Protein backbone atom coordinates (compact mmCIF):
# COMPACT_ATOMS: atom_id res chain seq x y z
CA UNK A 1 0.00 0.00 0.00
CA UNK A 2 1.39 3.38 -0.99
CA UNK A 3 1.86 6.17 1.52
CA UNK A 4 -0.81 8.19 -0.32
CA UNK A 5 -3.39 5.37 -0.04
CA UNK A 6 -2.55 4.92 3.61
CA UNK A 7 -3.31 8.57 4.37
CA UNK A 8 -6.56 8.36 2.40
CA UNK A 9 -7.71 5.43 4.55
CA UNK A 10 -6.77 7.27 7.73
CA UNK A 11 -8.68 10.35 6.56
CA UNK A 12 -11.74 8.23 5.73
CA UNK A 13 -11.61 6.57 9.16
CA UNK A 14 -11.35 9.96 10.83
CA UNK A 15 -14.40 11.22 8.91
CA UNK A 16 -16.37 8.13 9.98
CA UNK A 17 -15.44 8.69 13.64
CA UNK A 18 -16.50 12.35 13.45
CA UNK A 19 -19.84 11.39 11.86
CA UNK A 20 -20.49 8.72 14.52
CA UNK A 21 -19.69 11.12 17.37
CA UNK A 22 -21.90 13.81 15.84
CA UNK A 23 -24.77 11.36 15.42
CA UNK A 24 -24.48 10.07 18.99
CA UNK A 25 -24.54 13.61 20.36
CA UNK A 26 -27.46 14.64 18.16
CA UNK A 27 -29.39 11.61 19.42
CA UNK A 28 -28.07 11.92 22.97
CA UNK A 29 -31.13 10.53 24.74
CA UNK A 30 -31.37 7.36 22.69
CA UNK A 31 -27.61 6.79 22.66
CA UNK A 32 -27.10 7.03 26.39
CA UNK A 33 -30.26 5.11 27.20
CA UNK A 34 -29.30 2.26 24.86
CA UNK A 35 -25.64 2.11 25.73
CA UNK A 36 -25.70 2.54 29.49
CA UNK A 37 -29.15 1.48 30.61
CA UNK A 38 -30.37 -1.59 28.70
CA UNK A 39 -33.88 -2.59 29.80
CA UNK A 40 -34.15 -6.22 30.85
CA UNK A 41 -36.92 -8.23 29.22
CA UNK A 42 -37.53 -9.94 32.56
CA UNK A 43 -39.44 -8.19 35.31
CA UNK A 44 -37.31 -7.12 38.23
CA UNK A 45 -38.28 -9.03 41.40
CA UNK A 46 -40.76 -7.12 43.55
CA UNK A 47 -40.54 -7.48 47.32
CA UNK A 48 -43.54 -6.46 49.39
CA UNK A 49 -42.79 -3.53 51.70
CA UNK A 50 -39.38 -2.81 50.16
CA UNK A 51 -40.14 0.78 49.09
CA UNK A 52 -41.74 1.45 52.47
CA UNK A 53 -38.57 0.28 54.23
CA UNK A 54 -36.48 2.54 52.03
CA UNK A 55 -38.89 5.43 52.60
CA UNK A 56 -38.60 5.07 56.37
CA UNK A 57 -34.83 5.65 56.08
CA UNK A 58 -35.50 8.98 54.38
CA UNK A 59 -38.76 10.19 55.86
CA UNK A 60 -38.99 8.36 59.18
CA UNK A 61 -41.71 6.01 60.42
CA UNK A 62 -44.26 8.77 61.01
CA UNK A 63 -45.07 8.88 57.31
CA UNK A 64 -46.47 5.32 57.39
CA UNK A 65 -49.47 6.46 59.40
CA UNK A 66 -50.57 9.07 56.88
CA UNK A 67 -53.33 8.44 54.31
CA UNK A 68 -52.33 9.09 50.71
CA UNK A 69 -55.48 11.09 49.98
CA UNK A 70 -57.44 13.45 52.23
CA UNK A 71 -60.64 11.97 53.66
CA UNK A 72 -63.91 13.69 54.54
CA UNK A 73 -64.24 11.94 57.90
CA UNK A 74 -61.00 13.51 59.14
CA UNK A 75 -62.42 16.99 58.64
CA UNK A 76 -66.15 16.46 59.19
CA UNK A 77 -66.43 14.13 62.18
CA UNK A 78 -63.08 14.82 63.78
CA UNK A 79 -61.55 18.25 63.47
CA UNK A 80 -58.01 17.35 62.48
CA UNK A 81 -55.88 20.39 63.27
CA UNK A 82 -53.24 21.25 60.71
CA UNK A 83 -50.07 22.99 61.77
CA UNK A 84 -49.25 24.53 58.41
CA UNK A 85 -51.00 26.41 55.64
CA UNK A 86 -51.00 25.17 52.05
CA UNK A 87 -49.04 23.70 50.38
CA UNK A 88 -47.68 21.94 53.49
CA UNK A 89 -50.97 21.68 55.41
CA UNK A 90 -54.62 22.71 55.29
CA UNK A 91 -54.69 25.35 58.03
CA UNK A 92 -57.16 28.09 57.14
CA UNK A 93 -58.59 26.19 54.16
CA UNK A 94 -60.71 23.64 56.00
CA UNK A 95 -64.13 25.03 55.02
CA UNK A 96 -63.29 25.03 51.32
CA UNK A 97 -61.71 21.60 51.62
CA UNK A 98 -64.82 20.16 53.27
CA UNK A 99 -66.94 21.14 50.28
CA UNK A 100 -64.45 19.57 47.88
CA UNK A 101 -64.15 16.32 49.84
CA UNK A 102 -67.95 16.02 49.88
CA UNK A 103 -68.03 15.64 46.09
CA UNK A 104 -64.80 13.73 45.45
CA UNK A 105 -63.49 10.40 46.72
CA UNK A 106 -60.45 9.20 48.65
CA UNK A 107 -60.25 5.45 48.14
CA UNK A 108 -57.40 3.62 46.48
CA UNK A 109 -58.90 1.47 43.69
CA UNK A 110 -59.25 -2.25 44.37
CA UNK A 111 -57.15 -2.94 41.26
CA UNK A 112 -54.20 -1.40 43.13
CA UNK A 113 -55.06 -2.50 46.68
CA UNK A 114 -55.37 -6.15 45.65
CA UNK A 115 -51.88 -6.36 44.16
CA UNK A 116 -49.52 -8.57 46.15
CA UNK A 117 -46.63 -6.35 45.16
CA UNK A 118 -47.10 -2.96 43.54
CA UNK A 119 -44.65 -2.19 40.73
CA UNK A 120 -44.73 1.53 39.97
CA UNK A 121 -43.06 3.92 37.57
CA UNK A 122 -43.08 7.70 37.90
CA UNK A 123 -42.86 9.20 34.42
CA UNK A 124 -41.24 12.61 34.45
CA UNK A 125 -41.65 15.17 31.69
CA UNK A 126 -37.97 15.45 30.80
CA UNK A 127 -36.57 15.87 27.29
CA UNK A 128 -34.53 12.70 27.70
CA UNK A 129 -37.69 10.65 27.15
CA UNK A 130 -37.75 11.79 23.54
CA UNK A 131 -36.69 8.93 21.23
CA UNK A 132 -36.30 6.63 24.27
CA UNK A 133 -38.68 3.94 22.93
CA UNK A 134 -39.68 3.20 26.54
CA UNK A 135 -43.42 3.18 25.91
CA UNK A 136 -43.80 -0.60 25.97
CA UNK A 137 -41.69 -0.90 29.11
CA UNK A 138 -43.68 1.78 30.93
CA UNK A 139 -47.01 0.16 30.06
CA UNK A 140 -45.99 -3.07 31.85
CA UNK A 141 -45.91 -1.48 35.32
CA UNK A 142 -48.88 -1.97 37.66
CA UNK A 143 -49.05 1.74 38.44
CA UNK A 144 -47.98 4.51 36.06
CA UNK A 145 -47.81 7.98 37.62
CA UNK A 146 -47.73 11.01 35.33
CA UNK A 147 -47.31 14.72 35.96
CA UNK A 148 -49.35 17.79 35.13
CA UNK A 149 -50.22 18.33 31.47
CA UNK A 150 -47.68 15.87 30.02
CA UNK A 151 -49.28 14.43 26.86
CA UNK A 152 -49.56 10.77 25.98
CA UNK A 153 -51.31 11.00 22.60
CA UNK A 154 -48.68 11.11 19.86
CA UNK A 155 -45.85 10.09 22.22
CA UNK A 156 -46.94 6.54 23.08
CA UNK A 157 -43.76 4.97 21.71
CA UNK A 158 -41.61 6.92 24.16
CA UNK A 159 -43.85 7.41 27.22
CA UNK A 160 -46.49 4.67 26.95
CA UNK A 161 -50.26 4.99 27.00
CA UNK A 162 -51.15 3.76 30.48
CA UNK A 163 -51.93 6.32 33.19
CA UNK A 164 -52.96 5.11 36.63
CA UNK A 165 -52.45 8.38 38.51
CA UNK A 166 -51.96 11.91 37.22
CA UNK A 167 -50.87 14.63 39.64
CA UNK A 168 -51.94 18.13 38.69
CA UNK A 169 -52.76 21.61 40.00
CA UNK A 170 -55.19 24.11 38.39
CA UNK A 171 -52.62 25.95 36.28
CA UNK A 172 -51.28 22.64 34.92
CA UNK A 173 -54.70 21.16 34.09
CA UNK A 174 -54.57 22.23 30.44
CA UNK A 175 -54.99 18.74 29.01
CA UNK A 176 -57.98 16.81 27.72
CA UNK A 177 -58.74 14.19 30.40
CA UNK A 178 -60.55 12.04 27.83
CA UNK A 179 -57.56 11.90 25.47
CA UNK A 180 -54.53 11.99 27.75
CA UNK A 181 -55.88 9.67 30.48
CA UNK A 182 -57.53 6.26 30.72
CA UNK A 183 -61.15 5.90 31.89
CA UNK A 184 -60.00 4.74 35.33
CA UNK A 185 -57.16 7.26 35.80
CA UNK A 186 -57.09 8.93 39.22
CA UNK A 187 -56.74 12.71 38.93
CA UNK A 188 -54.90 13.82 42.05
CA UNK A 189 -55.03 17.51 42.94
CA UNK A 190 -51.88 18.98 44.47
CA UNK A 191 -53.14 22.09 46.25
CA UNK A 192 -50.70 24.97 46.64
CA UNK A 193 -53.23 27.58 47.80
CA UNK A 194 -56.83 27.88 48.94
CA UNK A 195 -57.94 29.06 45.49
CA UNK A 196 -57.00 25.62 44.14
CA UNK A 197 -59.76 24.09 46.26
CA UNK A 198 -62.14 26.82 45.10
CA UNK A 199 -61.32 26.10 41.45
CA UNK A 200 -61.88 22.34 41.65
CA UNK A 201 -65.16 22.89 43.51
CA UNK A 202 -66.50 25.23 40.81
CA UNK A 203 -65.42 22.83 38.06
CA UNK A 204 -66.96 19.72 39.62
CA UNK A 205 -70.13 21.43 40.87
CA UNK A 206 -70.53 23.60 37.76
CA UNK A 207 -70.60 26.81 39.77
CA UNK A 208 -69.51 30.26 38.69
CA UNK A 209 -65.88 29.97 37.66
CA UNK A 210 -63.04 31.73 39.43
CA UNK A 211 -60.62 33.67 37.24
CA UNK A 212 -58.38 35.46 39.72
CA UNK A 213 -55.81 34.21 42.18
CA UNK A 214 -53.77 32.09 39.75
CA UNK A 215 -50.42 32.74 38.13
CA UNK A 216 -51.88 31.26 34.93
CA UNK A 217 -55.56 31.01 34.03
CA UNK A 218 -56.71 27.42 34.68
CA UNK A 219 -59.33 25.72 32.49
CA UNK A 220 -62.87 27.02 32.84
CA UNK A 221 -64.35 23.82 31.40
CA UNK A 222 -62.87 20.48 32.44
CA UNK A 223 -64.87 17.33 31.77
CA UNK A 224 -64.00 14.87 34.53
CA UNK A 225 -65.84 12.42 36.76
CA UNK A 226 -65.73 13.76 40.36
CA UNK A 227 -65.34 10.20 41.65
CA UNK A 228 -62.01 9.94 39.83
CA UNK A 229 -60.65 13.04 41.60
CA UNK A 230 -58.54 12.78 44.74
CA UNK A 231 -56.92 15.41 46.98
CA UNK A 232 -53.30 14.62 47.82
CA UNK A 233 -52.45 14.75 51.49
CA UNK A 234 -50.21 17.85 51.84
CA UNK A 235 -48.19 15.92 54.40
CA UNK A 236 -46.27 14.47 51.46
CA UNK A 237 -45.38 17.95 50.24
CA UNK A 238 -44.18 18.72 53.76
CA UNK A 239 -41.87 15.73 54.05
CA UNK A 240 -40.54 16.14 50.50
CA UNK A 241 -39.64 19.74 51.35
CA UNK A 242 -38.24 18.92 54.78
CA UNK A 243 -36.54 15.55 54.37
CA UNK A 244 -35.41 15.73 50.75
CA UNK A 245 -34.69 19.43 50.24
CA UNK A 246 -34.21 20.72 53.80
CA UNK A 247 -36.57 23.60 53.08
CA UNK A 248 -38.13 25.61 55.91
CA UNK A 249 -41.83 24.72 56.17
CA UNK A 250 -42.82 28.11 57.55
CA UNK A 251 -41.62 30.62 54.96
CA UNK A 252 -42.22 34.33 54.36
CA UNK A 253 -45.17 34.83 52.00
CA UNK A 254 -42.97 36.36 49.32
CA UNK A 255 -40.54 33.44 49.42
CA UNK A 256 -42.36 30.23 48.63
CA UNK A 257 -39.90 27.46 47.91
CA UNK A 258 -41.48 24.11 47.23
CA UNK A 259 -40.76 20.73 45.63
CA UNK A 260 -41.66 20.12 41.99
CA UNK A 261 -44.60 17.88 41.17
CA UNK A 262 -42.05 15.30 40.03
CA UNK A 263 -40.26 15.06 43.36
CA UNK A 264 -43.63 14.99 45.10
CA UNK A 265 -44.71 12.10 42.86
CA UNK A 266 -41.61 10.09 43.81
CA UNK A 267 -42.39 10.74 47.49
CA UNK A 268 -45.95 9.54 46.93
CA UNK A 269 -44.77 6.42 45.09
CA UNK A 270 -42.42 5.45 47.92
CA UNK A 271 -45.44 5.35 50.24
CA UNK A 272 -47.89 3.71 47.84
CA UNK A 273 -45.72 1.15 46.06
CA UNK A 274 -43.36 -1.74 46.77
CA UNK A 275 -41.01 -1.12 43.83
CA UNK A 276 -40.40 2.35 42.39
CA UNK A 277 -38.74 3.18 39.09
CA UNK A 278 -38.47 6.61 37.51
CA UNK A 279 -38.03 7.80 33.93
CA UNK A 280 -37.57 11.19 32.32
CA UNK A 281 -36.20 13.04 35.34
CA UNK A 282 -33.44 15.63 35.28
CA UNK A 283 -32.79 19.02 33.74
CA UNK A 284 -30.03 20.24 31.39
CA UNK A 285 -26.93 21.79 32.88
CA UNK A 286 -27.52 25.39 33.96
CA UNK A 287 -25.04 26.57 31.33
CA UNK A 288 -27.09 24.95 28.55
CA UNK A 289 -29.49 27.74 27.61
CA UNK A 290 -30.89 26.12 24.46
CA UNK A 291 -31.75 22.56 25.52
CA UNK A 292 -35.49 22.04 25.89
CA UNK A 293 -36.54 20.64 29.27
CA UNK A 294 -39.68 18.71 28.26
CA UNK A 295 -40.21 15.97 25.70
CA UNK A 296 -43.31 17.66 24.29
CA UNK A 297 -42.66 21.42 24.15
CA UNK A 298 -39.95 23.90 23.26
CA UNK A 299 -39.24 25.61 26.58
CA UNK A 300 -35.88 25.93 28.32
CA UNK A 301 -34.63 26.31 31.89
CA UNK A 302 -35.40 30.02 31.62
CA UNK A 303 -39.07 29.15 32.13
CA UNK A 304 -38.25 27.86 35.64
CA UNK A 305 -37.14 31.29 36.86
CA UNK A 306 -39.36 32.47 39.68
CA UNK A 307 -41.07 29.09 40.01
CA UNK A 308 -39.93 28.51 43.59
CA UNK A 309 -38.23 25.27 42.54
CA UNK A 310 -34.54 24.57 43.17
CA UNK A 311 -33.79 22.02 40.46
CA UNK A 312 -30.13 21.68 41.47
CA UNK A 313 -31.12 20.69 45.00
CA UNK A 314 -33.73 18.30 43.66
CA UNK A 315 -31.13 16.64 41.46
CA UNK A 316 -29.03 15.97 44.57
CA UNK A 317 -32.08 14.51 46.35
CA UNK A 318 -32.92 12.18 43.46
CA UNK A 319 -29.30 11.10 43.11
CA UNK A 320 -29.28 10.25 46.81
CA UNK A 321 -32.40 8.08 46.42
CA UNK A 322 -30.84 6.35 43.41
CA UNK A 323 -27.60 5.66 45.26
CA UNK A 324 -29.37 4.14 48.26
CA UNK A 325 -31.55 1.99 46.00
CA UNK A 326 -34.85 3.55 47.05
CA UNK A 327 -35.67 4.12 43.37
CA UNK A 328 -34.16 2.97 40.09
CA UNK A 329 -33.89 4.92 36.87
CA UNK A 330 -34.96 3.83 33.39
CA UNK A 331 -33.25 6.82 31.79
CA UNK A 332 -29.88 8.38 32.55
CA UNK A 333 -29.64 10.99 35.29
From Swiss-Prot:
Enzyme class: transferase
Segments on the Cytoplasmic face: 1-8
Annotated TM spans: 9-26
Family stated for the protein in its record: Belongs to the glycosyltransferase 29 family.
Gene3D superfamilies found in the cross-reference section: Glycosyl transferase family 29 (3.90.1480.20)
Cross-referenced CDD domains: GT29_ST3GAL4
pH profile of the protein: Optimum pH is 6.4.
Annotated Gene Ontology cellular component terms: Golgi cisterna membrane
Keyword Cell membrane appears in the UniProt entry: no
Protein encoded by which gene: St3gal4
SS bond partners: 120-273
Compartment(s) where it occurs, according to its Swiss-Prot or TrEMBL record: Golgi apparatus, Golgi stack membrane
Source organism of this protein record: Mus musculus (Mouse)
EC identifiers of the protein: 2.4.3.2, 2.4.3.4, 2.4.3.6
Record-given protein name: CMP-N-acetylneuraminate-beta-galactosamide-alpha-2,3-sialyltransferase 4
Knockout or disruption consequences: Knockout mice suffer from bleeding disorders and thrombocytopenia due to deficient ASGPR-mediated clearance of plasma VWF/von Willebrand factor.
Glycosylation sites recorded in the entry for this protein: 61, 131, 310, 329
A molecular function (GO) term: beta-D-galactosyl-(1->3)-N-acetyl-beta-D-galactosaminide alpha-2,3- sialyltransferase
Tissues expressed in: Broadly expressed among tissues with highest levels in the small intestine and colon.
Amino acid sequence: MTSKSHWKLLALALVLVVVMVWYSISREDRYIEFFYFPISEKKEPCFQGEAERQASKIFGNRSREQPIFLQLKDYFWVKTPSTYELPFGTKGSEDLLLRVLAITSYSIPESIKSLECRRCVVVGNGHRLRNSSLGGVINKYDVVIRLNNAPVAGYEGDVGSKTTIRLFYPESAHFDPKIENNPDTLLVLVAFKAMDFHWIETILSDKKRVRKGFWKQPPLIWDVNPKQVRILNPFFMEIAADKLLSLPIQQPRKIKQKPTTGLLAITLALHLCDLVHIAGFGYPDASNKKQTIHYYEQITLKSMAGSGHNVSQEAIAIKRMLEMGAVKNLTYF
